Amino acid sequence: MMNLKYLLFFCLVQALHYCYAYGDPSLSNELDRFNPCPYSDDTVKMIILTRENKKHDFYTLNTIKNHNEFKKSTIKHQVVFITHGFTSTATAENFLAMAEALLDKGNYLVILIDWRVAACTNEMAGVKLAYYSYAASNTRLVGNYIATVTKMLVQQYNVPMANIRLIGHSLGAHTSGFAGKKVQELRLGKYSEIIGLDPAGPSFKSQECSQRICETDANYVQIIHTSNHLGTLVTLGTVDFYMNNGYNQPGCGLPIIGETCSHTRAVKYFTECIRHECCLIGVPQSKNPQPVSKCTRNECVCVGLNAKTYPKTGSFYVPVESKAPYCNNKGKII
């Protein structure tokens, strides 16, 4: 039933794509007339996690200084923002698992952005899929919110931009991109990295760089492609990893029907790449289907937090298995 709903969702979104402008709410007067998923700073929440404090309490811009880390004069952690997508939440199991993997890996300050109201998560189950266009139009506003928190970190807590990384899934990937644009507009500099996990395709894949996540949004933009309907095969970043060619992920069933599974696999893949060094290896598209066993550090790239330490950029094919940890490298590390 859920797969049928998403199949209908594809058709609806593609029709709406020709009726409305997306990515910038100022471009669409029609969306302003009736918005069932309105954006407000007050409805965006943050879960702030460290190794010492893993409570899933919610904070806002007004209450963030109640958190112990924000009572200090300086924050010395590397900071990672995680942003969910359409009809999801920061408390979804896959995002909490990613946050936990980060904390196991290093002494990070993890900020999960919960914009469920503007992402239409709270709407009636049978109706909210029709509201995708409203959530898409809110992404820039949520990106501006992340930029506001970033400004606080930089100016009040002496966090260098080089210590801040953004991770976003689906619409959350574009939200992260808009945050990257906004911090540059505020003259804060660039984020060290933005990681887009299967960035949403509908409403964005045909847009110019200013209206979607783009390689100029951070010093390094890593994109993981896992679906070609909910996601996109368009190259967007410094490096673009096409997992199993970017669609129909192993273990997700038939094309289209398994699209939702493929779309969410991006989060699972990246979480495994946090847990396991060089879990998944990207082979240059020009050399596909070269086996990863022939890869060297100078031509291939490992997906994950260390991707930017490799010299190669561009598009990469990544073979994956159907079950966690999804590695197809037979223990090879480059």
UniProtKB/Swiss-Prot annotation:
Q: Name one GO biological process term.
A: killing of cells of another organism
Q: Report the domain of life of the source organism.
A: Eukaryota
GO terms (molecular function) for this protein are: phospholipase A1 activity; toxin activity
Q: Which residues does the record annotate as propeptide?
A: 24-33
Q: List the disulfide bonds in this chain.
A: 37-120, 209-214, 252-261, 278-302, 279-327, 295-300
| KW Metal-binding (keyword) present | no
Catalytic activity of the protein: a 1,2-diacyl-sn-glycero-3-phosphocholine + H2O = a 2-acyl-sn-glycero-3-phosphocholine + a fatty acid + H(+)
- What tissues express this gene product? Expressed by the venom gland.
Write out the PTM section of this UniProt entry. Not glycosylated.
* Chaperone is among the record's keywords: no
Record: active site: 170, 198, 263
**A Pfam family it matches:** Lipase
Q: What general EC class does the enzyme of this chain belong to? A: hydrolase
- Spell out the subcellular localization from the entry: Secreted
- Function recorded in the entry: Catalyzes the hydrolysis of phosphatidylcholine with phospholipase A1 activity (3.6 U/ml). May act as an allergen and induce hemolytic activity. In vivo, a mixture of this protein and Ves a 1.02 is able to paralyze crickets.
Annotated signal sequence is: 1-23
Q: What is its main location?
A: secreted
* Protein family: Belongs to the AB hydrolase superfamily. Lipase family.
An annotated GO cellular component of this protein is: extracellular space
State how activity varies with temperature: Loses its activity after heat treatment.
Q: What is its EC number?
A: 3.1.1.32
Keywords assigned by UniProt? Allergen, Cytolysis, Disulfide bond, Hemolysis, Hydrolase, Lipid degradation, Lipid metabolism, Neurotoxin, Secreted, Signal, Toxin
Gene3D superfamilies to which the protein is assigned, alphabetical: alpha/beta hydrolase
* Name used for this protein in its record: Phospholipase A1 1
Origin organism of this chain? Vespa affinis
